[in-house]
Curated annotation (Swiss-Prot):
One annotated GO biological process: ubiquitin-dependent protein catabolic process
Domain PCI, chain residue ranges per copy: 171-338
Described purpose of this protein according to its UniProt entry: Component of the 26S proteasome, a multiprotein complex involved in the ATP-dependent degradation of ubiquitinated proteins. This complex plays a key role in the maintenance of protein homeostasis by removing misfolded or damaged proteins, which could impair cellular functions, and by removing proteins whose functions are no longer required. Therefore, the proteasome participates in numerous cellular processes, including cell cycle progression, apoptosis, or DNA damage repair.
Keyword Nucleus: no
GO cellular component labels: cytosol; nucleus; proteasome accessory complex; proteasome regulatory particle, lid subcomplex
Keywords: Proteasome
InterPro entries listed in its UniProt record: PCI_dom, PSD13_N, PSMD13, WH_DNA-bd_sf
Protein name per Swiss-Prot or TrEMBL: 26S proteasome non-ATPase regulatory subunit 13
Coiled-coil parts of chain: none
Protein species of origin: Bos taurus
Keyword flag Transferase: no
Self-association state and partner proteins as the record states: Component of the 19S proteasome regulatory particle complex. The 26S proteasome consists of a 20S core particle (CP) and two 19S regulatory subunits (RP). The regulatory particle is made of a lid composed of 9 subunits including PSMD13, a base containing 6 ATPases and few additional components.
Family the entry assigns: Belongs to the proteasome subunit S11 family.
Phylogenetic lineage: Eukaryota, Metazoa, Chordata, Craniata, Vertebrata
PROSITE patterns: PCI (PS50250)
Length: 376
């Protein structure tokens, strides 16, 4: 049995600046007000004053461990995550988290958060195989939770960092966007917003099978790059989203300075040419989606002889559906893969809808005027 009152009294005298906080902890502990005490401890461990040294480890050993069985499991893990940060030996931290996981197994969310923390430590020490297994395990558990919870953001932060480490651009792009969807952007420092926006933008451009940039373009995190020396990335993403090959080539003086993009220039050109074909299909009315080889060649900046190969590639990866008329050198499109639209593309849809409404109105008036002749 630990001398909890003695520890609290000693802490009050050793840190006069925080005496009131220690007194409050002692008061709540003595009165056995466990919920209020949990909230107070949560605030306590997040105070920057206690972030240095091993003060939180001592707090756990001499105080929290005495009543942790009365604490909400998820709150307990939240508290322990702050304690673990003061453990310099990762193996000690991992062992501590494993023991904690057993203590909170009554709560799926607490177990998920604990496993996510274990995965993050494994990633930090370079154990990629265990990190991968942890992510797969936790992902399955998350799918059984109702809605989005407080543990989702921590999981997507871990998974995106793992995919970034192994160079899987497409998976990083997907999970990094999911992370941003689970947090309030205002809670992230501007420097972190800029770094996340930059790595997300690069991953979107370089990721295999990533043809949907609308969600990133509409996310406020991208605005952190505006009017900075990385503004060119926003411009490049907009060029890709609209399939503007000419704009992409004009921006080469900027994106060509980024080593990863410069090394993958041919791949980037193929991707934006496919996006160009998608955009040409999307902007046409549904009843007029016949594209000539010349039109495609002109927009995609390729020769007429290369058009058929481009269309076949788009068909094979499921970006569009349609048929190729080699004799007349035309392509008839029947479907284009849905994407998150930017404001300009939404405006285009609005204009087409207004045109359709006008067309329907004209037909209505025609039928109204000619109804007598038709009926007789």
């Amino acid at each position: 049995m630990k001398d909890v009152p003695g520890f609290l009294q000693q802490s009050q005298s050793s840190g006069p600046g925080q005496a009131a906080v220690w007194h409050r902890l002692e008061e709540l502990y003595t009165k056995k007000l466990w919920h209020q005490l949990t909230l107070q401890v949560l605030d306590f461990v997040q105070d920057p004053c206690f972030a240095q040294g091993d003060g939180l480890i001592k707090l756990y050993e001499n105080f929290i461990s005495e009543f942790e069985h009365r604490v909400n499991p998820l709150s307990l893990v939240e508290i322990i995550l702050h304690v673990v940060r003061q453990m310099t030996d990762p193996n000690v931290a991992l062992s501590f988290l494993e023991k904690t996981r057993e203590k909170v197994k009554s709560s799926d969310e607490a177990v998920i958060l604990c496993k996510t923390a274990i995965g993050a430590l494994k990633l930090n020490i370079g154990d990629l195989q265990v990190t991968k297994e942890t992510i797969e395990d936790v992902e399955e558990m998350l799918s059984n939770l109702p809605g989005v919870t407080s543990v989702h953001s921590r999981f997507y932060d871990l998974s995106s960092k793992y995919y970034q480490t192994i160079g899987n651009h497409a998976s990083y792009y997907k999970d990094a966007l999911r992370f941003l969807g689970c947090v309030d952007i205002k809670d992230l420092p501007v420097s972190e917003q800029q770094e996340r926006a930059f790595t997300l933008g690069l991953a979107g451009l370089l990721g295999d099978g990533v043809f949907n940039f609308g969600e990133l373009l509409m996310h406020p995190v991208l605005e952190s790059l505006r009017d900075t020396d990385r503004q060119w990335l926003i411009d490049t993403l907009y060029a890709f989203n609209s399939g503007n090959v000419e704009r992409f080539q004009t921006l080469k003086t900027a994106w060509g300075q980024q080593p990863d993009l410069a090394a993958n220039e041919a791949q980037l050109l193929r991707k934006i040419q496919l996006l160009c074909l998608m955009e040409m299909t999307f902007t046409r009315p549904a009843n007029h989606r016949q594209l000539t080889f010349e039109e495609i060649a002109r927009s995609a900046k390729i020769t007429v002889n290369e058009v058929e190969l481009l269309v076949m590639k788009a068909l094979s990866v499921g970006l569009v559906k349609g048929s190729i008329d080699e004799v007349d050198k035309r392509v008839h499109m029947t479907w284009v893969q849905p994407r998150v639209l930017d404001l300009q593309q939404i405006k285009g849809m609005k204009d087409r809808l207004e045109f359709w409404c006008t067309d329907v109105k004209s037909m209505e008036m025609l039928v109204e005027h000619q109804a007598h002749d038709i009926l007789t």
